[in-house]
Design a protein with these regions (language model features):
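Accessory regions of macromolecular translocation/handling assemblies
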Residues: 1-424
């Protein structure tokens, strides 16, 4: 054995100094992740210039995902510190004013006015210093955002990002998806991408109701419903584009056929699993098809027999777009939809609803669990999303295709061509 006799030759290069390589000479090990980019050195006293991908992760996509969530948290905490400082300054001013008014000597004459003026000056000074710190932090985050945004891959990028003009159908499953942008009133031009992990863990509800926000109330009902359906179509197109060919299918329920215009990018490209379903019969057929799929996959998973699924069962991810819910839905269809919302995501069936909750008020509280199970977003700006760190109300805006751009149609044409080639 080692240490007995001189029959074993030393490894080339080893001369008894330095660390010993204990790796097996013929056993391959997984390569460590490439190190994240390092920021160039900064001048003394200055923050280091930001670098895209400056976070932990095994891939560039994961590092960018973690970096964006880090920016999200940094912005939330910076604004929380500023708001806390302003609240403290105003609270202290109120206390000083109360003390000044409670002293009879200060109620009359110039002494009281001087005490009140000093209290207000101190409040303004504290507020100004807090704002100076906030502006410094926001400037650093804006500089980081300016570096990160151009480096984002297609699943994370806005529709105005040049990455979409060089789009190619991916070969690997995506990690996350951009649902829209978030901002706070302290600096509305600093937008944080809202990224969600894939596959989706819960369905999405695009609220087409006019009572949701001031922006919604100021938008006409027909216009708001069209914007909501446009948002659903661009989200479905993004999902189709970021998955490999034929790994993601989109189904549509449009009971009255009211969304034909908004659905044109999907129908014209031929990327839907079937034509949009309309009428009670169409609604029933689509729900029965997807319910059967969820049932079969659940049974196969529980039995540990995934290989026993019927050969006609598509094992990819599925998205069901439902327009104008609950129109066209009877009690049985509503029950099936709730089942898909609850049990579908775990087995690859996801729900994207375009609905006004007021339209479903006749169903009463029976639909409350359905609404709660869905991630609510809006077709216009609305401050209804809350962060998990300090509880700010963030204004959400969906990803929109730039006016006059054909990028959506171009991307869907490439998706359709890849699906046809993969089916041969």
């Amino acid at each position: 054995g080692p240490g007995r006799g001189g029959g074993r030759q030393r490894r080339s290069g080893y001369r008894g100094r330095g660390p010993i390589d204990y790796a097996h000479p013929r056993r391959q090990t997984s390569a460590p992740p490439p190190p994240p980019p390092t920021a160039p050195s900064a001048a003394p006293g200055q923050p280091a210039p930001p670098v895209a991908g400056d976070a932990t992760g095994w891939s560039m996509d994961e590092r960018l995902y973690n970096q964006i969530w880090g920016m999200f948290e940094d912005l939330a905490r910076a604004v929380a510190a500023y708001r806390s400082a302003v609240d403290f300054a105003e609270s202290r001013m109120e206390q000083e004013l109360d003390r000044a008014l409670s002293d009879p000597r200060h109620r009359m004459g110039g002494a009281g006015d001087l005490a009140r003026e000093r209290a207000r000056d101190r409040c303004q000074d504290l507020t100004a210093r807090a704002r100076e710190v906030l502006d410094r932090d926001l400037s650093q985050l804006a500089a980081e955002s300016a570096v990160v945004e151009p480096a984002l891959p297609a699943p994370y990028a806005g529709w105005d990002n040049p990455v979409w003009h060089g789009y190619r159908v991916p070969m690997e499953l995506p990690m996350a998806l951009r649902l829209g942008d978030l901002h706070l009133p302290e600096r509305t031009d600093l937008r944080i991408p809202l990224l969600v992990r894939l596959p989706l863990e819960r369905g999405v509800w695009i609220d087409s109701g006019r009572t949701a926000s001031e922006a919604a109330a100021a938008t006409g009902g027909d216009r708001l419903r069209r914007l909501a359906m446009d948002t659903a179509v661009t989200l479905a197109a993004r999902l189709l584009a970021v998955y490999p060919a034929n790994e993601f299918s989109v189904h549509v329920i449009d009971p009255a056929g009211a969304a034909a215009g908004a659905l044109a990018p999907l129908t014209d490209a031929g990327v839907l699993a079937a034509p949009p379903a309309s009428g009670a019969g169409g609604v029933s057929a689509v729900l029965a098809h997807l319910t059967r799929r969820v049932d079969l996959v659940q049974m196969a998973v529980r039995a540990g027999a995934a290989d026993s699924l019927p050969p006609d069962l598509d094992t990819g991810e599925h998205l069901l777009i439902v327009n104008d819910f609950p129109h066209g839905f009877d009690d049985r269809a509503v029950t099936q939809l709730r089942y898909l919302a609850d049990d579908g995501p775990a087995v690859g069936v996801h729900l994207l609803m375009v609905a006004d909750r007021e339209d479903a008020r006749d169903h009463g509280p029976v639909l409350d669990p359905l609404w709660r199970s869905l991630l609510r977003v809006t077709p216009v700006a609305d401050d209804h999303l809350v962060d998990p760190w300090v509880g700010h109300a963030w204004t959400y805006e969906p990803c929109r295709v730039p006016e006059g751009s054909r990028v959506l149609e171009q991307v869907l044409a490439l998706v359709a061509a890849a699906r046809r080639a993969d089916s041969r």
